[in-house]
């Protein structure tokens, strides 16, 4: 991402990232703050594993089981986990689309990506961000619970938290109008 911004030599960007991509944006903004005007972080999680008082959403055993299931039956895992991630049972087509996306991915790459994602711990990086940020969090998210959004907001110096009236980890797909409204309201205040 930094190489692209450097090559295009654009003015400071407004970065929008969802889930893992949100944390990639956080790391990029730490590395090259002059390249970013604002960060919009949709359902970010600096750590998915519970740790002491920190509630990331999963125990270590649950993550180990999830990764083991991926290793043993990637396609079955994809079909099972997609509705959990989407959290929109009234719109099964969204879960089907997500499962289909998983199934089109190279399983070896997807497993490596999942392992890196679920085992990473970027909590200490949050305090290093100097870029103003909007944190969008779903009211009910099985992947990154509400407490994660609160944690991210508390540890980003210049951040605003908006809790969306939504369930699931993909509000950009399930309630895009809420995401767009929150982004517009935030950016209008700049």
Regions found by a protein language model. Give the residues of each.
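Conserved alpha/beta-hydrolase catalytic His-Asp/Glu region
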Residues: 50-58, 68-128
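Flexible "cap/lid" loop of the alpha/beta hydrolase fold
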Residues: 26-72
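Conserved alpha/beta-hydrolase "nucleophile elbow" surrounding the catalytic nucleophile
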Residues: 13, 17-19, 138
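Short beta-strand/loop motif that positions the catalytic acidic residue
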Residues: 129, 135-137
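Conserved acidic catalytic loop of the alpha/beta-hydrolase fold
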Residues: 1-13
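Catalytic active-site module of serine/aspartate enzymes centered on a nucleophile-bearing elbow/loop
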Residues: 158-190
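Short alpha-helix in the alpha/beta-hydrolase fold that links the catalytic acid
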Residues: 115, 122, 131, 145-154
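Acidic catalytic loop of the alpha/beta-hydrolase fold
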Residues: 140-144
């Amino acid at each position: 991402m930094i190489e692209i911004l450097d090559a295009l030599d654009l003015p400071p960007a407004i970065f929008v990232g969802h889930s893992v991509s949100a944390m990639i944006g956080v790391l990029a903004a730490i590395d090259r703050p002059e390249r970013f005007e604002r960060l919009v972080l949709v359902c970010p999680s600096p750590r998915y594993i519970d740790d002491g008082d920190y509630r990331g959403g999963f125990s270590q055993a649950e993550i180990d089981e999830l990764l083991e299931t991926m290793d043993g039956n990637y396609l079955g895992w994809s079909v099972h986990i997609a509705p959990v991630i989407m959290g929109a049972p009234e719109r099964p087509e969204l879960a089907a689309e997500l499962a289909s996306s998983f199934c089109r991915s190279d399983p070896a790459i997807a497993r490596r990506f999942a392992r890196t994602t679920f085992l990473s711990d970027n909590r200490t990086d949050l305090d290093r961000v100097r870029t103003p940020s909007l944190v969008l969090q779903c009211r009910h998210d099985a992947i990154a619970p509400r407490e994660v959004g609160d944690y991210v907001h508390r540890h980003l110096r210049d951040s605003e938290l908006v809790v969306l009236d939504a369930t699931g980890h993909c509000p950009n797909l399930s309630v895009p109008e809420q995401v767009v409204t929150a982004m517009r309201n935030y950016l209008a205040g700049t």
